[in-house]
Amino acid sequence: MSEQNESKKHINLQKAYNLSSPEDNVDFYRGWAEDYDIDFAGVMDYILPYQVATQFIKLNGEGPVLDVGAGTGLLGIEISKLNKIEMHATDISEEMLLVAEKKGIYSKSIVGDLTKGLPILDNTYNGIVSSGTFTHGHVGPEALFEITRILSKGGLAVLSVNSKHWHSLGFDNVLEMLKETGLVANVTEVRIYGDKCEADTKDDTAYLLTLSA
């Protein structure tokens, strides 16, 4: 890995973590979409999409599935390797979704802001997955209510949440509120990056939040 690639990756990741509004996210990912898979996912040995995908399939997740914060489709690719399920993608960045569409794994793409409500009817999806969206500078715990709104009765959601982000924003409090509505929730900790990652963040972890309606 060249020093130039390492430096560029580090700068972009820190910028992503420091975003403060939906508008910031749209602007930032507009300029990173075409290079994201190589510049970040490849260089960082980003295995979180694989972690989410394997958990979803292990728990017998079914379609149709909505990939929330789908980005360039890395999670969708991992799911498609394990099972052929109908998948839709949603992201705040149209440019990221355009890259995802080229992979041919989603039958529908929806540009939308999870924090403001998605243009989707209640109880639409049997499965909802998300990798890397609930993290610094992106989406907080309040968005879990929107996730549960569009999850069908008997459905399954598997969402990754950066572990530091979880504790700093109080995901536990929202999770307790969701449990009071009858949702079953489980949390496991996984690595975000693989053994090839050499960045300062190489040991960062995420919680896989599993919600059963």
Predicted regions and their residues:
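A short glycine-rich, Lys/Arg-flanked "PGG" loop and its adjoining helix->strand segment in the class I
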Residues: E142-K153
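Class I SAM-dependent methyltransferase SAM/SAH-binding core
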Residues: L66-G117
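Conserved SAM-binding loop and adjacent beta-strand
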Residues: D37-A53
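Class I S-adenosyl-L-methionine
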Residues: L183-A213
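Conserved Class I S-adenosyl-L-methionine
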Residues: L169-V190
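N-terminal auxiliary segments of SAM/dcSAM-dependent transferases
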Residues: M1-P22
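A short acidic, Gly/Pro-enriched loop at the edge of an enzyme's catalytic core
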Residues: L118-I128
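Conserved beta-strand signature within the Rossmann-like core of class I S-adenosyl-L-methionine
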Residues: G154-N162
